[in-house]
Regions:
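Surface-exposed, charged secondary-structure patches
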Residues: 75-120
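Bacterial Sec-dependent N-terminal signal peptides
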Residues: 1-26
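Short, low-complexity N-terminal intrinsically disordered segments enriched in polar/charged residues
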Residues: 19-54, 58, 147-150, 154-170
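A mature extracytoplasmic/lumenal domain signature
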Residues: 56, 66, 96, 103, ...
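A short gly/proline-enriched turn/hairpin at secondary-structure junctions
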Residues: 61-71, 82-89
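Hydrophobic pocket/interface hotspot
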Residues: 40, 52-53, 60, 76, ...
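Glycine-rich beta-strand-turn "strand-cap" elements at beta-sheet edges
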Residues: 98-101, 142-144, 165-167
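Short beta-strand edge/turn micro-motifs at domain boundaries
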Residues: 122-150
């Protein structure tokens, strides 16, 4: 009986340690991703083109606030280059960030509320650990709209987006 109790106590201790160790690993990874995303935002604010785009994986996608803005890395670089060259980039600061992991810990996804020149926006995306570094695979920037003013926003954007909707349906 004593041996059985000791055996099960030992098993419980090992399982507890494994769970705590996995949680600690993800906390370390969350910190790394948070630092990476903050650096990503600072590089844009400083108009540091090379540093900013180095945060993206070679095969990555940027999805902007306009319905037509879906770019691979090269296309996004081409679009953004004039803004970086003229020092007319964006300055985003994270207000609240959530980070989640795949079971194997190689992929993470995040959502965050950002303080921007457009007021509160939402950044979300997928990051992958590539050669020991977290890289952005997909980034989505969305303008948040308070529910109380959605009808007014829809009224303003309807003439523009009705045309786009018709083009996309063809």
């Amino acid at each position: 009986m004593k041996k059985t109790t000791i055996f099960f106590t030992l098993i419980i201790c090992i399982l507890s340690f494994t769970t705590i160790s996995a949680q600690a690993k993800f906390e370390k990874e969350k910190t790394e991703i948070g630092i990476m995303l903050d650096g990503f935002n600072v590089a844009a604010a400083k108009a540091d083109f090379n540093t900013y785009f180095n945060y993206f994986a070679e095969e990555s996608t940027f999805i902007g606030t306009d319905a037509t803005e879906v770019w691979d890395k090269k296309a996004f670089m081409n679009w953004a280059k004039p803004y970086f060259d003229k020092n007319k980039t964006w300055n985003f600061t994270s207000l609240k960030r959530n980070i989640y992991f795949s079971k194997d810990g190689k992929i993470a996804w995040f959502d965050e509320l950002l303080d921007t020149q457009m007021k509160i926006c939402r950044g979300s995306g997928v990051v992958e650990k590539i050669n020991g570094q977290w890289k952005v695979k997909q980034y989505v920037l969305s303008v948040t709209v308070p529910n109380d003013v959605v009808d007014k926003v829809v009224e303003i954007k309807a003439p523009i987006e009705d045309i786009l909707i018709q083009k996309m349906k063809q």
